[in-house]
Amino acid sequence: MAGRLLAISDLHVGYPENRGLLDGLRPSDPDDWLIVAGDVGEIFADVGYVLATLASRFARVIWTPGNHELWTLPPDPVALRGAARYEALVKVCRRFGVLTPEDEFGVWQGPDGPVAIAPLFALYDYTFCPAGAVTKEQALALAREAGVVCADERWLHPDPYPSREAWCHARVAATSERLAALDLPAVLVSHWPLLRAPTEALRHPEFAPWCGTTLTAGWHRAHRVAGVVYGHLHIPRATWHDGIRFDEVSVGYPREWQRRGGAAPAPRVILGG
């Protein structure tokens, strides 16, 4: 019997409380698949350790990067920046059989399948502007006023691209080609939301410029999409757009998930539940 397709994101294992959650991330069925939609942590070795651990437990693990994996922090002995850092993370994933946006899409054969599981890496280009801004410069000014400038501005380097938005546009173009070749229904997996609508729930709307790109807004309509999984916002919930379920599956920081009360955060069932 096929297992379930589960999803989680924003584990942020740099926090001891979050790292302690790793032991509880185990399948209930040996055939369960797990999506990890970015922000495992910031330190290169931590990301590899977590993904290797999960790959040893689940039948299949699918990962796509968040912004935190792409940071280059002074304490990290791996000083790779930008695309080189991402490519090195992909190599680590392949060593443990974890699927990435650079691999052939895995096909889930559960009761709702076959369904392609498509991890996407599109980044952002500052086009999710808050009210009162129409340009990147205006959006950044509003974020500075609100005190919510994303740490990406300091730690996420776009090398060899001239800017994060240039890297984003290259990723969007490459991803669009891959999606156009899909011949199965797919679950789209992105760290950043594919639509602007989910960012309307942000406590600080000035943070939206770091949350995606308007270039991905039509992907869920242009393809046979069985569901969309994302993280980044630290607002776990399910919403519906154009008849398709969008699951935000983040754990978030300890102060966030502890405030929600109840049991420790668990992966969301996407298919097969």
What would you call each of these model-derived segments?
Residues A118-V187, L194-R203:
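Active-site-proximal loop/helix segment associated with metal-binding centers of metalloenzymes
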Residues M1-W63, E69-P74, G273:
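N-terminal active-site segment of His-dependent metallophosphoesterases
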Residues A83-G147:
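Hydrophobic alpha-helical segments and helix pairs
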Residues Y49-A55, T100-P101, G106-P114, T135-K136, ...:
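Short amphipathic alpha-helices and their capping/turn segments at secondary-structure boundaries
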Residues M1-L6, F105-P119, W240-R245:
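Beta-strand-turn-beta hairpins that frame and shape the catalytic cleft
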